[in-house]
Each structure stands twice: as structure tokens, then as C-alpha cells.
Amino acid sequence: MTINKEGLRVDACSGDPMSIFGLWYEEVLRVKSVREPSAMVLATCDSENRPSARVVLLKRYSDAGFEFYTNLESRKAREIALNPCVSLVFDWRPIYKQVRVEGIAEFMDASESDAYFASRSRESQIGAWCSRQSMILEDRDVLLSKIELMEREYEGREIPRPKFWGGIRVVPNVIEFWMDGKHRLHDRRQYSKNIDGTWTSVYLYP
């Protein structure tokens, strides 16, 4: 596939940032060289305002926000419980585009988490049960032994969702679209959500 650096001009997009995101996301999904188009950097802060960041996978997006699933005892989930203000970054270099999101993270309903967990592969379900994410692992064999035990325990049976695993939705209040331009004259357009739910957009210097 030949990449067109001019691409979809930011100033030609609609006034709905989620529609723009959808167009860009569909574009990057078609680029075979992008191994994880759903990868996004999630930045959080602890109670002392010390930041941390990691890559998570976008599982769904809608007007309600950007959704991912994780161990709810992990560092990111603990920090979100203390401070729900987060940031996301989608870095799509092969198509010369980036999306930055600022928003409020909220824990999703159990029914939503149950439905998504049921759709996962059996191996991923077992992995969710056996991984004490971010905790110290003395030896990898310990984890593999837990997996083997659970495989035997639930052989031929449905695996329920662990209570410590679920979904988080980032409700955006700022979305910025960045696109590479010649001579570093990049396109940047920032959308900010108004109290009534509408969006106001401005252009930013590159």
C-alpha cells in the first residue's frame, strides 16, 4: 500500500471528533505494516502526582468514549481509582498521524465486563485469572503452574470473569488530531467538549 502523506486533511474533517477518529482508525486498520493499530499509550498519576504510562489495547470506541480491559488490581487501575484524569495517545507513524486524548476514566458496569470476558479465548480467560498484574513474580514457572492447575480445574466448564478484572472507559473532554506536514508545518486541530456535550475546535501552531 502506498501511503499518501497529504492523507485526510484535518481542516477538511467534520465537527465531530469521534467521527474523525473513526475515519483515521479505519484508515490505519488497512495498513498491514501496523501490527497493533489499537495500541494506545495510557498515562495516569498516583496520589503524589507521579506519572506512569503504558500501552494498552483499545477494544471499542463510541460517542461514550474509548474502552479497554485490564486487571482492576493493577497499578493503572489503582491510580485511576485515586485520580480518574488520564491521557491517551495513538501514535500511527506509518500514516503520519497521531491522536491525543484527555479525559476522565470510569469503571464499566459488570454486565459489560462479563459480556466482553465471555467473548475472549479460553486461554486469555485463564490468563486473566492467573496473572497478578504488576505484582512481583518470583519465577515464571510459578505462573505456568497456576495456568496448568486452572486448565484442569475448569476442563469442560465455563470460566467466569474474575471480580478483579473489568473494563475502563475514558470519557474524552479534549481530543487533538495531529498530522505530519512538510517542513514540520504539521496540522493540529484540538476539540474541547462543552458543558452541553457539543464540541468546539481550534487550530494549534505546529
From Swiss-Prot:
Q: Which InterPro entries match?
A: Pyridox_Oxase, Pyridox_Oxase_CS, Pyridox_Oxase_N, Pyridoxamine_oxidase_dimer_C, Split_barrel_FMN-bd
* Presence of the UniProt keyword Transmembrane in the record: no
Query: Which cofactor is recorded for it?
Result: FMN
Q: In which pathway does it act?
A: Cofactor metabolism; pyridoxal 5'-phosphate salvage; pyridoxal 5'-phosphate from pyridoxamine 5'-phosphate: step 1/1; Cofactor metabolism; pyridoxal 5'-phosphate salvage; pyridoxal 5'-phosphate from pyridoxine 5'-phosphate: step 1/1
What is the E.C. number? 1.4.3.5
UniProt cofactor note? Binds 1 FMN per subunit.
Provide the residue positions that the database annotates as binding FMN. 54-59, 69-70, 75-76, 98, 133-134, 178, 188
Its name, as the record gives it, is Pyridoxine/pyridoxamine 5'-phosphate oxidase
Which GO MF terms are attached to this record?
FMN binding; pyridoxamine phosphate oxidase activity
Family according to the record:
Belongs to the pyridoxamine 5'-phosphate oxidase family.
Q: Which reaction does it catalyse?
A: pyridoxamine 5'-phosphate + O2 + H2O = pyridoxal 5'-phosphate + H2O2 + NH4(+); pyridoxine 5'-phosphate + O2 = pyridoxal 5'-phosphate + H2O2
Lineage, top-rank taxon, reads Bacteria
Binding-site residues, substrate? 59, 116, 120, 124, 184-186
Q: Which SUPFAM superfamilies match?
A: FMN-binding split barrel
